[in-house]
Amino acid sequence: MGIKTQKNFICLKRTFSMNLRDAISVANPVQLEEEIKHDEVVSFLKSKNLLDKPVILNVEGKKVAKNFVSSRETLGKYLGVDAYSIARELSKIEDREAEIRVEPFSSLAMKKVDVNLQELPVIKYFPRDGGRYITAGIVIAQRNGVYNASIHRMLLLDESRVAARLVPPRHTYLMWREAVEREEELEVAVVIGTHPLFLFASATRVPSGKEFSYAAGLMGRLTLYRKGEMLVPDSEIILFGRITAETAKEGPFVDITGTYDIVRDEPVIVFDEMYVKEDYIYYSITPAGKEHQMLMGVPYEPVIYRFVSNVCKVKNVITTPGSCHYFHCVVQIEKKSEGDGKNAIIAALAANPSMKGVVVVDDDIDILSYEDMEFAIATRFQPDRDLVVVKGARGSSLDPSADKTTSKWGIDATKPLGKEGFDRVV
């Protein structure tokens, strides 16, 4: 990342930090003292009706936090906006200049411990899982002065090794391949238990090396801590290691649709050092839970917002919970010309190749209300003129109904201009 530039306002004078513990007052988690085993977490949360609610659990004597980004309302609180304003707020972040400060790693209140991943409360979520998985580990990679931060699931292999799912051609994968081709290893840090906005930034696809800048924009400013050539945020657990040329079987693992992903050969990360805070809080994302889906899909909302703004007056964008916040979206526009709805559909599908369906509505429709959206479809949409179908397009590998390519659809559920009988009285 370009952290040497003036634009990022690097400052070494004083520390400003936002961390996981700062977020507790916002997330307001239910804190449960009853001790459970690492393979009982999902069933326990279901029994308490807390599967998608912010919680801090006692897993084998260790604190485990979950679901701090499991609703639009909570994400909005971190951003200082309401649930309706998230896409608009996020669409401004990339252009926002924010301060990044760098402090020595020694200024973090952490202790070095022997590397033993088995001592962490790493969870096995479902019986058919390939093993215990770190699901909220942010991999920070550095190569040639460029930094990347992204979330990768990691299957525990032993006390010091994991198999990490690296998706080609995303940035961490490309950095690793470059290192392997030069017969080198990719130096990384894996951080667990950051502020939720740093977690969200790491789930967002931004230009190469811009995750720190994006996180700073989300958080107002960002403090990073330098250890050698590596920069890390304030975290509960920090592991330093390297992604090697060795691979190991990774999977099965439940993805956002609640279905199992396939088993693959994935790179092995070897950890050499481990640091933890006193009484650390381990952070975990439940596969296919609302938080998993939010982190996968909501970062696309500002991208769709910006794409649609190029073709018409966009008011709002949401990804829909029924589509795992990933496959479908609703776009709200202020219609000025006939054809705006169809242009919005085309722009939204172009913004995210994984998007499968788009509904475009007017600004009198409550975009967060499924009933309002269905009302718009029922009273303003005619399939023979308002339905757009795109055949043979590239879709998402996460869609079990797709076979290499997919069909995509769009519904223009906007009112025709200048016609009476469409305005709502109640």
From Swiss-Prot:
InterPro entries: UbiD, UbiD-like_C, UbiD_Rift_dom. One of its GO terms (molecular function) is carboxy-lyase activity. Mn(2+) binds at N148, E211. It comes from the Archaea. One of its GO terms (cellular component) is cytoplasm. Pathway: Isoprenoid biosynthesis; isopentenyl diphosphate biosynthesis via mevalonate pathway. The keyword Transcription does not apply. The keyword Manganese applies. The active site is at D255 (proton acceptor). Its EC number is 4.1.1.126. Keywords: Decarboxylase, Flavoprotein, FMN, Isoprene biosynthesis, Lyase, Manganese, Metal-binding. Its cofactor is prenylated FMN; Mn(2+). Catalyzes the conversion of trans-anhydromevalonate 5-phosphate (tAHMP) into isopentenyl phosphate. Involved in the archaeal mevalonate (MVA) pathway, which provides fundamental precursors for isoprenoid biosynthesis, such as isopentenyl diphosphate (IPP) and dimethylallyl diphosphate (DMAPP). Belongs to the UbiD family. This is Anhydromevalonate phosphate decarboxylase. It comes from Archaeoglobus fulgidus (strain ATCC 49558 / DSM 4304 / JCM 9628 / NBRC 100126 / VC-16).
